Amino acid sequence: MAVPDLPPPHPRSRECSDEAARHALAALPGPYLPWGSSAMRPAGLVAVCNDIVVNGRRRVVELGSGISTVLLARLLNQRPPLGGFRVAAVEHDAGWAQWVREQLNREGTGSQVVIVHAPLVPHPLAEPGLSWYDAAALAEGLRTAMRGEPIDLLVVDGPPAHGAGHGLARYPALPGLRDRLGPGATVVLDDAERPGEQEVLRRWERETGLHFDRRAEATGVAVARLAGEDPVTGPRHS
């Protein structure tokens, strides 16, 4: 049965969620970051940070890099007792990947994250006319960052999917990386309120049997957890 489309988010609900999230993110201080419209919403980023802290995620892969990458590195840098973190941020744009890498180095957190430059190329899992990350570059980057261990948090915020005809650009993420996910892993899809991402979620659910908790109005993200360990859900936005 098809999942009905989400209603449009109430502007005030978004404002309240993001305002509360900004207060939480103030605990990750550092230099000013250029937060643009394409960045993950503050409420979505807090949902990701909650999963890392509450469920002890240590092997994180982020598709699409930027402000979220820098803030996640700040979080990991704050919490040395957790230890053993392996983080890969996959980016198709070489110039932007370099900016993120340099920003991490300026903040002294460059050792926390491996920036993987993987250009967008034709891919067998992509829709006709669309591209996904170069398989060889992605595999090599994940091999370096994960060192053969399974991913326990996958954040899908790339490649760009906002342009006309690009709504399904992020579909390959789950079928392409499913075999790399460990038991109990969390999958997060950003921009879950958009029609293209809603269709991606429907396909993922139909093909994998996963159920995505759609938090688009409050956080902008949809979240699912694979079978396995019983995670603590942690605080949620109301």
What kind of feature is each model-predicted range?
Residues M1-A39:
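Rossmann-like AdoMet
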Residues S38-P122:
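SAM cofactor-binding core of SAM-dependent methyltransferases
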Residues R57, P150-D152, G184:
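Local beta-strand N-terminus motif with an aromatic residue
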Residues R79-P81, R147-G148, L177-P183:
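Short, conserved loop/helix-junction motifs that constitute active-site signature segments
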Residues R101-E149:
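S-adenosyl-L-methionine
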Residues L33-S37, P124-L125, P160-G165:
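Surface-exposed cleft-lining segments at the edges of enzyme active sites
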Residues M146-G158:
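Short SAM/SAH-binding signature in class I
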